[in-house]
Amino acid sequence: MKIGFIGAGKVGFSLGQFFVQGGLPVTGYYSRHRGSAQEAAAWTGTKQYESLESLVRASDALFLTVPDGAIASVFAQLREFDLAGKQICHCSGALT
């Protein structure tokens, strides 16, 4: 199962690093802050994706590691893509 991260802040960065160290296949990161995605990808030896769609296509599971306030808008964007067979997890929780 190939894992992709939407959001490359502290949670996405740390969780991706943990997964890679555990031998799980991480495809990489997409973030509205390109520099954060580049840094997380470099640190984990993965890829920084230029578009959300390319990350979705490359991944079987998607971790939303964005702030609570961004979950709804990110999910609205995700619904535009073929999500059949994909697992979507979010790592926020103050609101949900």
What are these regions (language model features)?
Residues 44, 49-96:
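Rossmann-like NAD(P)(H) cofactor-binding subdomain of soluble oxidoreductases
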